[in-house]
Swiss-Prot record:
Broad class of where this protein is predominantly found: nucleus
UniProt record similarity statement: Belongs to the SAPAP family.
Pfam families xrefs: GKAP
Compositional bias per record (Basic and acidic residues), positions renumbered to this chain: 135-145, 180-193, 232-241, 249-278, 642-654
Gene: Dlgap5
Annotated keywords: Cell cycle, Coiled coil, Cytoplasm, Cytoskeleton, Nucleus, Phosphoprotein, Ubl conjugation
Subcellular location: Nucleus; Cytoplasm; Cytoplasm, Cytoskeleton, Spindle
Protein name in UniProt: Disks large-associated protein 5
Residue numbers carrying Phosphothreonine: 337, 386, 617, 728
Modified residues (Phosphoserine): 66, 70, 201, 328, 598, 607, 612, 620, 743, 797, 806
Function statement: Potential cell cycle regulator that may play a role in carcinogenesis of cancer cells. Mitotic phosphoprotein regulated by the ubiquitin-proteasome pathway. Key regulator of adherens junction integrity and differentiation that may be involved in CDH1-mediated adhesion and signaling in epithelial cells.
Region (Disordered): 134-282, 377-413, 629-654, 735-757
Tissue: Expressed at low levels in normal resting liver. Up-regulated in regenerating liver after partial hepatectomy.
Length: 808
């Protein structure tokens, strides 16, 4: 139901008729309100209808007025709501203002508790050479005036005069007449006039002190001057009271007023003025200034120190020393000569309340500054050498270190490195210019080249390394660069640069020695300087190769010399050889039932045939055999002529014979293949030693008869050569064993020797092939043919494989 009721009401209110009705009602109400407002403003009373009787007029009037006032009540109600809201806002605003005021008061109280931060002019402590009496002494708080009655300025003046401390006798103010005021005014004028005279010593124009006094008189504020003028006027009126009879108003003064202190200040100024005028001479010059050089330093300024008598304080190690800026000539003269120009800024630092106080302080400061500066000037004149040494000391070095630096080593700081860099640059540049001038002389080209090399290296060192070092010094001094550069870094870098500087110095010394020797030894120093070192490992290897090549060349030259003397050696050998050797130069093979004799082919002939087959160049036996014989005959000539021991002579002969064969073999190999020369020559000695050892071991084991040594040697050689050529030989001699029974014993012995020699030849051939370089068997096809030939020479037997015969 609620939903339907509200819905019907909404539809009713939203109808067109209801909207028109509401508009008409509102319009009528507004018209009534306007009419009543105009009526109340113009007439202030209700309208009276004449038709209404008197009795009902009041009621009607009341009713009408009640009806008329009903919209007024509604408007008053609405107006009252607005007023209430505005009143509430006003109350909130007032409350906010009160809270804000309370907050300000609380903050002020808290600030007062914490203390107010005061801002003012900072007055630093006075330096030692200035006056410290009046600046250092603080004004004592004035005590309250102990008087119960009425306090006047005259009474406070009398009290301050009684309690004043000092030896000055100031006449008390008397109440005579107005002449004292007239006397005081001329004194003030005289004081202002006399002030220029105090500082015009030696100057005809107005001094800077007079200008300072005028400037200060202008800067004094009016609030500072008023109490002084008022005090003087009241003093005058007070003094004039007995004569004039007019009562002067005496304002009550507080005990802590500044007026008595100002009066006392004026009196102090009078006393100081009288003392200054008494001290001045007839020309306005101070008497003390004339006797300044003879005066001793004031002892009152000396401060007591707890340090020992000769103790010198030094700053810590890491503390940066104070750097004094250099003085210009004008500032140096102003500092050393006694004048008062430096006092121009004094009024800004120490300002006083009155002109009299400022003038008095300036006078006393001028006197003491003149005294101090004159003393400093005298001390500087007496110790000129000490001051010069101090001013010439290196920048950044403390005074204590500067005085002791003559005996100790100077510290390695930035000025030290700059100084040493400049000195080295100047020295090396002078050397370069000196030696460049000597290039025009008539000297050798090698000496000129050496001079140009040394000078160029020196200039490159100055341009590159010295400039780099200078940049590092700048970085250290001005704190530049990505990383901080310290003096230790500079020291290490200079150590590296000094090695190059020493090298250049050594080269200049070599040039000086070369010049002293008359430019004669110019080749040796240049080679020593310009030659580069060779790596020791490569040197040893190359040396070994060179030694091997030299040994191979020497052996080849010996073989060639032996071949040149071949014809003469052949003739001598044929003439000296006995006929018996021709019979023995046969190999005899006895099989028991038959006997075979064949001519002997020498070992050198066999080897030469093999070499000819190997390289494809056929060699005739007539050409090869004499070469082997020539080498063998050359070695035989070196043997002693006397008959040696059989064993030793046989072993030596076999050794030489085999070595001759090996030498001829090496010669044949070296001639067509020069690439294999080095390796074969290097291993030649090793092969020879192995052959000697094998031959010696075999020969010692052979049972030999005590026959002729030469015959046995030849038989052994023929047996070896015959065994190697038994297969290829075709000259066979067969004999009946029955007819040769007388030689059974000899044949058995020869057979044993032949077997031993065959074994010796096998071992010799195999060992020689094993000792040959492996590269030959891999690279050259001739070596394969060579290895096949000895194998063929070894394949022979002593049985029926060679020749088959039927038994008898």
């Amino acid at each position: 139901m609620l939903v339907s009721r509200f819905a019907s009401r909404f539809r009713k209110d939203s109808s067109t008729e209801m909207v028109r009705t509401n508009l008409a009602h509102r319009k009528s109400l507004s018209q009534k309100e306007n009419r009543h407002r105009v009526y109340e403003r113009n007439r202030h009373f209700g309208l009276k209808d004449v038709n209404i009787p008197l009795e009902g007029r009041e009621l009607g009037n009341i009713h009408e007025t009640s009806q008329d006032l009903s919209p007024e009540k509604a408007s008053s109600k609405t107006r009252s709501v607005k007023m209430v809201l505005s009143d509430q806002r006003k109350q909130l605003l007032q409350k906010y203002k009160e809270e804000k005021q309370l907050q300000k008061l609380k903050e002020q109280r808290e600030k007062a508790k914490r203390g107010v931060f005061k801002v003012g002019l900072y007055r630093p402590a006075a330096p030692g050479f200035l006056v410290t009496d009046q600046r250092g002494a603080k004004a004592e708080p004035e005590k309250a005036f102990p008087h119960t009655g009425r306090i006047t300025r005259s009474k406070t003046k009398e009290y301050m005069e009684q309690t004043k401390i000092g030896s000055r006798n100031v006449p008390k103010a008397t109440q005579s007449d107005q002449r004292q005021t007239s006397e005081k005014q001329p004194l003030d004028r005289e004081r202002k006039v006399m002030q220029p005279v105090l500082f015009t010593s030696g100057k005809g124009t107005e001094s800077a002190a007079t200008q300072r006094a005028k400037l200060m008189a202008r800067t004094v504020s009016s609030t500072t001057r008023k109490p002084v003028t008022r005090a003087t006027n009241e003093k005058g009126s007070e003094r004039m009271r007995p004569s004039g009879g007019r009562p002067a108003k005496k304002p009550e003064g507080k005990p802590d007023k500044v007026i008595p202190s100002k009066v006392e200040r004026d009196e102090k100024h009078l006393d100081s003025q009288t003392r200054e005028t008494s001290e001045m001479g007839p020309l306005g010059v101070f008497r003390e200034v004339e006797s300044l050089p003879a005066t001793a330093p004031a002892q009152g300024k000396e401060r007591k120190s707890f340090a020992p008598k000769h103790c010198v304080f030094q700053p810590p190690c890491g503390l940066k020393s104070y750097q004094v800026a250099p003085l210009s000539p004008r500032s140096a003269n102003a500092f050393l000569t006694p004048n008062c120009d430096w006092n121009q800024l004094r009024p800004e630092v120490f300002s006083t309340t009155t002109q009299d106080k400022a003038n008095e302080i300036l006078v006393q400061q001028g006197l003491e500054s003149l005294t101090d500066r004159s003393k400093e000037h005298v001390l500087n004149q007496k110790g000129a050498s000490t001051s010069d040494s101090n001013h010439a000391s290196v920048k950044g070095v403390p005074c204590s270190e500067g005085s002791e630096g003559q005996t100790s080593q100077p510290p390695h700081d930035v000025p030290y490195f700059r100084k040493i860099l400049q000195s080295e640059t100047d020295r090396l540049t002078s050397h370069c210019l000196e030696w460049e001038g000597k290039l025009d002389l008539d000297i050798s080209d090698e000496a000129k080249g050496l001079i140009r090399t040394t000078v160029g290296q020196t200039r490159l060192l100055i341009k590159e390394r010295f400039r780099q070092f200078e940049g590092l010094v700048d970085n250290c001094e001005y704190k530049r660069g990505e990383k901080e550069t310290t003096c230790t870094d500079l020291d290490g870098f200079w150590d590296m640069v000094s090695f190059q500087v020493d090298d250049v110095n050594q080269k200049f010394n070599n040039l000086i020695k070369l010049e002293a020797s008359g430019w004669k030894d110019s080749n040796n120093p240049s080679k020593k300087v310009l030659r580069k070192k060779i790596v020791p490992g490569r040197t040893s290897k190359a040396k070994q190769d060179d030694d091997g090549r030299a040994a191979a060349r020497s052996r080849l030259a010996a073989i060639k010399n032996a071949m040149k003397g071949r014809p003469q050696q052949e003739v001598q050998a044929h003439a000296a050889a006995p006929e018996t050797t021709k019979e023995v130069d046969k190999i005899v093979f006895d099989a028991g039932f038959f006997r075979i004799e064949s001519p002997v082919k020498s070992f050198s002939v066999l080897s030469s045939e093999r070499r000819s087959q190997r390289f494809g160049t056929p060699l005739s036996a007539s050409k090869v055999v004499p070469e082997g014989r020539a080498a063998g005959d050359l070695l035989r000539q070196k043997m002693p002529l006397k008959k040696p021991d059989p064993q030793s002579s046989k072993s030596e002969h076999v050794d030489r014979t085999f070595s001759d064969g090996l030498e001829s073999r090496c010669h044949v190999e070296d001639t067509p293949c020069p690439g294999e020369q080095d390796s074969s020559d290097i291993e030649h000695d090793v092969n020879k030693i192995n052959v000697k050892m094998d031959c010696f071991s075999v020969e010692t084991n052979l049972p030999l008869p005590a026959g002729d040594a030469n015959t046995n040697q030849k038989e052994a050689i023929s047996a070896v050569e015959g065994a190697s050529t038994a297969v290829t030989s075709q000259d066979l001699l067969m004999s009946n064993p029955e007819t040769n029974t007388s030689s059974q014993s000899n044949t058995s012995q020869e057979e044993a020797e032949a077997s031993q020699s065959v074994l010796l030849h096998k071992s010799l051939t195999s060992e020689c092939h094993l000792l040959e370089p492996p590269g030959l068997s891999c690279t050259s096809p001739c070596t394969r043919e060579e290895t096949r030939q000895p194998d063929r020479s070894r394949q022979f037997s002593f049985g029926g494989d060679l020749i088959l015969f039927s038994p008898l």
